């Protein structure tokens, strides 16, 4: 029996179909959790979803060899609106066609531009191209508040609009960066345990990077969109031990739980997404 998303509780799980060509990377379906409903600052009458698990190991942004800032030259750019990851998440382009430069020194996440040559994704199709198009058609454009670092980007904050996006420290219940609230707390994130995320089997098996602690049974790092105020090249992420934030250089690998999206609350789960009853 079909249900509306709005009738389900925060924490309920939804399966979204992956197109057959991409199932080796993500499995046949990606599982999302309801993170909130009618969340402040998000589209009205919407339901917010986030992936249940860490679905890929990817860099936030690639090294920028022509950037005049030495940190960004070596490690990548932490300005969220310019990140490779955000662009890929919101693209429905075919394989190898999702990337375009967002500023004069921008660079794609090629093998040469990612940490230790692990897990480049410049040749992939855009993320939206990998999902059921009927589901993608229902995604709502959402405005996000993003802090800016004080070193290169002027401090304060800016807004970014997209359909898929990364959460902020504020939204997962961690400290505001430089006293800037990047949105408001999502209802799903009530304590440390609620921030724990585990890699999927496909995330582990598809990764060129290996580690004895990188497994489906152990929690791992996942990206946030928040840049530390005093750095040009690192980004906050939820870490494994204390489930608080740490920082990682943008070309380094962290795990992409990443996906937050909004759908109207009347969206029927039977249309393309299916509720998981557990």
Predicted regions and their residues:
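Collagenous Gly-X-Y triple-helix signature in extracellular proteins
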Residues: 1-278
């Amino acid at each position: 029996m079909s249900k509306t998303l709005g009738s389900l509780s925060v924490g309920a799980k939804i399966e979204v179909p992956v197109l057959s060509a991409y199932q080796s990377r993500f499995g046949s379906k990606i599982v999302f959790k309801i993170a909130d409903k009618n969340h402040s600052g998000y589209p009205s009458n919407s339901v917010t979803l986030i992936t249940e698990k860490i679905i890929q190991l990817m860099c936030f942004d690639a090294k920028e060899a022509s950037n005049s800032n030495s940190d960004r030259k070596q490690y990548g750019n932490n300005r969220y609106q310019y990140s490779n990851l955000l662009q890929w998440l919101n693209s429905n382009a075919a394989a190898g066609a999702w990337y375009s430069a967002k500023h004069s020194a921008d660079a794609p996440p090629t093998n040469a531009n990612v940490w230790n040559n692990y897990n480049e994704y410049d040749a992939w199709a855009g993320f939206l191209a990998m999902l059921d198009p009927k589901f993608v058609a229902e995604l709502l454009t959402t405005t996000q508040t993003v802090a800016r670092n004080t070193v290169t980007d002027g401090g304060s904050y800016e807004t970014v609009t997209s359909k898929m996006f990364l959460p902020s420290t504020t939204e997962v219940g961690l400290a505001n960066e430089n006293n800037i609230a990047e949105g408001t707390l999502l209802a799903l994130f009530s304590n440390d345990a609620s921030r724990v995320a585990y890699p999927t089997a496909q995330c582990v098996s598809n990764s060129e990077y290996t580690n004895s602690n990188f497994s489906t049974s152990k929690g791992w790092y996942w990206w946030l969109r928040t840049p530390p105020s005093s750095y040009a090249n690192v980004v906050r992420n939820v870490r494994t031990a204390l489930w608080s934030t740490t920082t990682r250089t943008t070309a380094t690998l962290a795990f992409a739980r990443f996906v937050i999206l909004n759908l109207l609350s009347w969206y029927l789960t039977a249309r393309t997404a299916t509720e998981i009853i557990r």
